[in-house]
């Protein structure tokens, strides 16, 4: 006996459920050995939907708009306006379902854009999967707001909404003490300036140097640094003897949490791909300089002694290597991880 064919309504319902499962990741924290499979399965799943052409985007957006108009007409009729005929109501309901199907399709086809942007923010206080979740919410909003008649490519339009959703999600959830979004943005600016000065000076910049470079007055820099502290150092003594520090009182969990494993794997993959484009000597210099192999950065002098070159030659090679990594094919990937 031949299998029963699914009705258009059933197909629409199944597609919508699939989109919901894809766009909204589960918040349960899996066991450590589950996480690579979960992330890999998600990436495989979202890759199953082909990317859209400009014509596809227009067609889907047109169907979405038709569905919105049909829904509004039904809601108006339900609030007391003259009711549509049964045939008209059936047509409107089918149009609503078709619009929802088109919306789900556009969301699924652009989930890879969210992952690409989420990787650039995953190291800023939220696990990678949580950042993807925030970005997916922005993507859904972009699909709802997209106006194809203005001639924009959807990915260009959606990027703004995804970035805003991720930034606000980080501002809301990434800190133990919640800070206003504008304060978080100032802290991010301050952190970038400090990294730039630290790299150029080869030492920690003073408050005055940070203020001058950032254009923020000294008192505001001091205040931002104070409110930006989100944790007590594990090396802080708990009494006057100094024999016991805060870290001694915290039990060792032995393993990283699963979302952290996924985040570190994503970053490690990006770094391996980028540094692998360098010559072996330059690759070693960057690995030592920034602690890529053991998490312990070295000074220029320490690197020079290790590789048998002068301090100035190491500085030159480091500068040349970083310039190579700032090339267009590498710049977006790595600078966004460092932002």
UniProtKB/Swiss-Prot annotation:
DNA-binding region ranges: 300-319
GO biological process terms, semicolon-separated: DNA-templated transcription initiation
InterPro entries: RNA_pol_sigma-70_dom, RNA_pol_sigma70, RNA_pol_sigma70_r1_2, RNA_pol_sigma70_r2, RNA_pol_sigma70_r3, RNA_pol_sigma70_r4, RNA_pol_sigma_r2, RNA_pol_sigma_r3/r4-like
Keyword Transcription regulation included in the entry's annotation: yes
Comp. bias (Low complexity): 1-10
Region (Disordered): 1-37, 71-101
Compositionally skewed regions (Basic and acidic residues) per UniProt: 91-101
Statement: the UniProt record of this protein carries the keyword Transcription regulation: yes
Motif placement: Polymerase core binding: 130-143
Subunit structure: Interacts transiently with the RNA polymerase catalytic core.
Name recorded for this polypeptide: RNA polymerase principal sigma factor HrdC
Originating organism: Streptomyces coelicolor (strain ATCC BAA-471 / A3(2) / M145)
Name of the encoding gene: hrdC
């Amino acid at each position: 006996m031949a299998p029963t064919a699914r009705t258009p309504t059933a197909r629409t319902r199944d597609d919508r459920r699939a989109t919901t499962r894809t766009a909204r990741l589960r918040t349960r924290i899996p066991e450590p050995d589950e996480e690579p499979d979960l992330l890999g399965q998600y990436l495989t799943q979202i890759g199953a939907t082909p990317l859209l052409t400009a014509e596809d985007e227009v067609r889907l957006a047109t169907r979405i708009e038709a569905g919105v108009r049909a829904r509004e007409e039904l809601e108006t009729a339900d609030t007391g306006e003259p009711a549509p005929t049964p045939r008209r109501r059936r047509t409107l309901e089918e149009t609503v379902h078709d619009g929802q199907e088109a919306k789900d399709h556009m969301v699924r086809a652009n989930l890879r854009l969210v992952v690409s942007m989420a990787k650039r923010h995953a190291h800023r206080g939220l696990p990678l999967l949580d950042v993807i979740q925030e970005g997916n919410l922005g993507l859904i909003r972009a699909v709802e707001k997209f106006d194809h008649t203005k001639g924009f490519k959807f990915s260009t339009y959606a990027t703004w909404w995804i970035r805003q959703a991720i930034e606000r999600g980080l501002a809301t959830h990434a800190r133990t003490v919640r800070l206003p979004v504008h304060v978080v943005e100032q802290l991010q600016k301050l952190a970038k300036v400090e990294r730039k000065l630290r790299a150029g000076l080869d030492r920690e910049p003073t408050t005055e140097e940070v203020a001058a470079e950032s254009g923020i007055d000294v008192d505001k820099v001091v205040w931002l640094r104070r409110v930006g502290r989100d944790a007590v150092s594990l090396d802080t003594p708990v009494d006057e003897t100094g024999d016991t520090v805060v870290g001694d009182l915290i039990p060792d969990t032995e393993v990283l949490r699963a979302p952290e494993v996924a985040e570190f794997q994503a970053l490690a993959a990006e770094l391996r791909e980028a540094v692998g484009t360098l010559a072996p000597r330059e690759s070693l210099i960057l690995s030592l300089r920034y602690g890529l192999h053991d998490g312990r950065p070295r000074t220029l002098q320490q690197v020079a002694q290790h590789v048998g070159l002068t301090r100035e030659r190491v500085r030159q090679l480091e500068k040349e290597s970083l310039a190579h990594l700032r090339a267009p094919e590498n710049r977006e990937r790595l600078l966004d991880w460092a932002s």
